[in-house]
UniProtKB/Swiss-Prot annotation:
Protein name per its UniProtKB record: Ixodegrin-like peptide
Position of the signal peptide: 1-21
Cellular compartments annotated: Secreted
Main location, first listed in the record: secreted
Chain ranges for the short sequence motif Cell attachment site as given in the UniProt record: 49-51
Annotated family: Belongs to the ixodegrin family.
Origin: domain of life: Eukaryota
PTM section of the record: Contains 3 disulfide bonds.
Gene Ontology terms for molecular function: toxin activity
Function: Tick salivary platelet aggregation inhibitor that plays an important part in the anti-hemostatic strategy of ticks. Inhibits platelet aggregation induced by ADP, thrombin and thromboxane A2 (TXA2). Blocks platelet adhesion to soluble collagen (most probably through the binding to alpha-2/beta-1 integrin (ITGA2/ITGB1)) and binds to purified glycoprotein IIb/IIIa (ITGA2B/ITGB3) in a dose-dependent manner. In vivo, reduces thrombus weight effectively in a rat arteriovenous shunt model and inhibits thrombosis in a carrageenan-induced mouse tail thrombosis model.
Tissue specificity field: Expressed in salivary glands.
Organism from which the protein derives: Ixodes scapularis
Keywords associated with the record: Disulfide bond, Hemostasis impairing toxin, Platelet aggregation inhibiting toxin, Secreted, Signal, Toxin
Length: 60
């Protein structure tokens, strides 16, 4: 019983880490062009979505 509980906690922890953002320096930083975004090469200035009106850095 204890081994199954420990295995479940390890699996839950691994799933939680996979669900976290890839880069904390890129997420939701206001920008005007790609040079304002820091971090990996995937971090780019993206157009607003939905009702938003300003550009933000994002890796997605």
């Amino acid at each position: 019983m204890n081994a199954a509980f420990i295995a479940a906690l390890l699996i839950l922890g691994a799933l939680t880490l996979d669900a976290m953002a890839y880069s904390f320096t890129c997420e939701r930083i206001p920008c005007t062009n790609n040079s304002d975004c820091h971090g990996s090469d995937l971090c780019q200035c993206r157009p607003p979505r939905g009702d938003g009106f300003s550009y933000f850095c994002s890796e997605y």
